Regions:
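SAM-dependent Rossmann-like transferase core, predominantly class I methyltransferases
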Residues: 102-165, 170-178
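Conserved SAM/SAH cofactor-binding pocket of Class I
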Residues: 147-231, 237
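Conserved Class I SAM-dependent methyltransferase catalytic core
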Residues: 192, 253-306
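Hydrophobic alpha-helical segments that drive targeting, anchoring, or assembly
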Residues: 10, 27-115, 133, 138-147
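Acidic, low-complexity/disordered tracts enriched in E/D and polar residues
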Residues: 2-67, 136, 363-455, 499-502
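Mobile active-site "lid"/loop adjacent to the S-adenosyl-L-methionine
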Residues: 193-194, 233-259
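Long, charge-rich, low-complexity alpha-helical segments
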Residues: 64-115, 171, 185, 358, ...
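Flexible, glycine-/basic-rich loop-and-beta segments that form/coincide
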Residues: 312-391
Length: 502
């Protein structure tokens, strides 16, 4: 039974504006590829850093596309005639009546953007996204656009096809846009009416059918279950207040994330997966992995990846700058002092940030909490799908005899690294490691027998026969080798360095 009715608030763009605007954007080719080609690599990179002038120069002679880039991306005032030509068949007056444009306040009769409307796309497709302008950032209900967190979650989401998907806390709708390419039915929720209005406009502009529901957290979908849930929730730990709806939960510390992790699995179909971003506290005297594990309900596979760790000062300063607060101003210092006092009083030594992958399971759950610090080039989405498959295989081979009877091979893209140290007689081998050159680039140190075992993992012989050969070659009892090897083999399989061979 549904506990919420579809959101019926006023969208930012009425239907009389949506169609003509879509026609104009399509005609002018207002897409990520076209904008990148117009600006060139240098100016496009500068714009990504917030440096507007190089992009303005590059777009100066860009025709109607250049007009839209200067108007909608760079925030410049453009003449009425140029805007009318670029947006035709939509008139500037109708665009202004819908809240997309505003008359310039310089008396020129020109127009400026009242909303952020930008192209967005990747291998999933091309879209347009509506959000608030950065200059509105001080407003409590500010709706952010395609930011770093949105991109991080999108790149980490498993894209295997599913029947139903929930985008919890949709904001301007970025995750739901992607979901429309791999989910048959998409539901998006948000607490903020302004976010829902902008998301509705984004979906309409892209001709997407998304069910929109208004309400906090999981209340709008009470009693419902989904094949996949994605969420970029308000995860910034701090005092129990809401300065900005998009980032502050209203609950102290990481309490909101803890409650969400505990409640989400009940809204998953059997085998369903939830993927979300989150931040957790490193509290004095506590082990942070144990803290996060304690939030998990029974019957859930979980993979928690810590991607970044910030000390309290860095945490507060980062989010002040994100909100456009000058940390050196009197107001900024007072705001920081209150936040830092709260963190200190709660015994917080650091704040972690990362990914949480939760899967509803009927089997013995697998829970892995680990660090993945530093930059990685490849998206994590395929890795999440692979990790879940490998967990299933390991669960089916949980008994030692089952694992010993399996045939394994070193995965493509895995290398053996050896390093040496200088000694009295030259270089001396100091150690070795196997490492993936793709995905998370997991790396495991190995000794000489382990390296020899991996060299034999070619999918021809089962693991028990390889260990017998290794026992003979290194004069070590096979039972001792089995006891030492099986935990490491399971970890290498889990990290994708060893793959099962049918």
């Amino acid at each position: 039974m549904l506990s919420a009715t579809p959101w019926l608030g006023a969208t930012v763009l009425p239907p009389t504006v949506t169609g003509p605007l879509r026609e104009a954007l399509t005609r002018v080719r207002y897409t990520t590829d076209a904008v990148r080609a117009l600006l060139g690599p240098s100016a496009h990179a500068a714009l990504g850093r917030g440096e507007v002038e190089p992009a303005a120069r590059a777009a100066r002679d860009g025709g109607e596309l250049g007009v839209l880039v200067r108007l909608l991306l760079l925030g410049e005032v453009e003449p009425d005639a140029a805007v009318a030509a670029a947006l035709a068949p939509l008139s500037p007056a109708d665009a202004a009546a819908a809240g997309l444009l505003a008359p310039a306040d310089d008396g020129s009769g020109g127009w400026t953007a009242a909303l952020d409307l930008r192209p967005y796309g990747d291998e999933d497709g091309d879209w347009w996204v509506l959000s608030d302008l950065d200059r509105r950032h001080q407003e409590r209900d500010h709706v952010t656009g395609v930011g770093a967190a949105s991109l991080t979650l999108a790149a980490a989401t498993d894209r295997t096809p599913v029947g139903s998907l929930l985008d919890l806390g949709t904001g301007c709708g970025v995750q739901a846009l992607h979901a429309g390419r791999h989910a048959r039915a998409v539901t998006a929720t948000d607490l903020a009416p302004r976010a829902l209005a902008l998301a509705a406009a984004t979906f309409a502009l892209n001709d997407l059918d998304v069910e929109l529901l208004e309400g906090p957290w999981l209340e709008p979908v009470a009693g419902r279950r989904f094949d996949r849930i994605v969420s970029n929730p308000p995860f910034v730990p701090g005092p129990a207040r809401v300065d900005y709806v998009y980032r502050d939960s209203g609950r102290a510390g990481d309490d909101a994330l803890a409650a969400l992790v505990a409640d989400l699995p009940a809204h998953l179909e059997p085998g369903g997966v939830a993927q979300l971003l989150g931040s957790w506290l490193h509290v004095r005297g506590e082990d942070w992995p144990d803290r996060v594990r304690s939030w998990l309900p029974p019957g859930v596979d979980a993979w928690i990846l810590q991607r970044e760790v910030a000390d309290p000062a860095l945490h507060v300063g980062t989010w002040q700058r994100d909100a456009g607060i000058d940390p050196a101003s009197a107001a900024g210092r007072a705001h920081a002092a209150q936040w830092l006092d709260w963190l200190d009083g709660a015994g917080v030594e650091a704040v972690g940030f990362g990914h949480l992958v939760l899967r509803r399971t009927d089997g013995p759950p697998t829970v892995v909490v680990e660090d993945l610090l530093g930059d990685i080039a490849d998206p994590l989405g395929p890795e999440v799908a692979g990790w879940l498959e490998r967990v299933d295989w390991l669960r089916a081979h949980a008994a030692d005899d089952a694992l010993l009877g399996a045939r394994l091979a070193v995965a493509d893209g895995v290398v053996l690294e050896t390093w040496s140290e200088p000694g009295d007689e030259g270089w001396t081998t100091a150690g070795s490691a196997v490492a993936r050159l793709d995905g998370p680039r997991w790396r495991h140190e190995v000794d000489t027998p382990a390296a020899a075992l991996l060299a034999g993992c070619r999918g021809a012989l089962p693991l028990d026969e390889l260990l017998e050969l290794l026992s003979f070659a290194h004069d070590r009892p096979v039972d001792a080798l089995v006891a030492a090897t099986l935990p490491a083999v399971r970890e290498l399989v889990r990290h994708g360095l060893l793959v099962p061979v049918p």
